[in-house]
Amino acid sequence: MEEPRVGTPAWLADEPLTIGGHVFTSRLFVGTGKYRDVEETRDCLAISGTQCVTVAVRRVDLTGQGPSLLDALDREKHVILPNTAGCYDAASAIRTAVLARDVLGTSLVKLEVLGDPKTLLPDPVGTLEATRELVAQGFDVLVYTSDDPRLGVRLAELGARAVMPAGSPIGSGQGVLNPFAIRILLELVTVPVVVDAGVGTASDVAIAMELGAAGVLLNTGIAAARDPRRMAAAMRDACSAGRQAFLAGRIPRKLYANASSPLEGLIHAAGRPGTP
């Protein structure tokens, strides 16, 4: 028997997801890096059905002086979620978030404070420091973190609007390596938990959603696929299927078989073992 959840988070209900005043009917968050060209970017975003698109602030032209990835985004259809990818300390992440707010006019920010360029794992101390400061400055912080449940709790207590634990290292395609940690985090916080990073294929998305995650953020899983457009459709469908399965409730795992057909009124063939 499953233990009861602590509280009843609104995002567990069969309702649209709300983060920072934005309402999302799609629970798939999609990044804009690594696509072959602008046309492929547009197509994949449209096919995925995403309503929230992440943009690496340090890797796009925000000046308006030349071609920019932002030109490919439909601001009527997509909420732009600027992220601080490429920042390795709290100070640079804070500066990047402030720049994004000034240029894009949004208080939303996906906070990333990375530990090193090889693993791209989040730095916990810098992440806590930057979260505290950005919340104090009025940002709606969606924070990328490890799958450590206690760290996720601390970030939620600091005022993060959503906690985004890594399923596995960024771009690794390893999927959700520690589903038990994600489940524990879901038990401990009432803000949305969005699994972020490491998604390699549609089944990874389905698993994250079946665990009870409020959403999944991915980029490489679509952009680096052999057929990105087809994979965008697969990720979209997996997100929906996983959410529906979670809401429906899976049957418990059992050691022994349990016949699905009723035994009452069973007709036994005469002469067979076990029959009258």
Task: Cite the ranges covered by each PLM segment.
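Basic/polar N-terminal segments that are highly enriched at the extreme N-terminus
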Residues: 1-15
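Alpha/beta enzyme core
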Residues: 14-19, 33-55, 64-79, 87-276
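Non-catalytic, usually N-terminal nucleic-acid engagement modules in DNA/RNA processing proteins
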Residues: 58
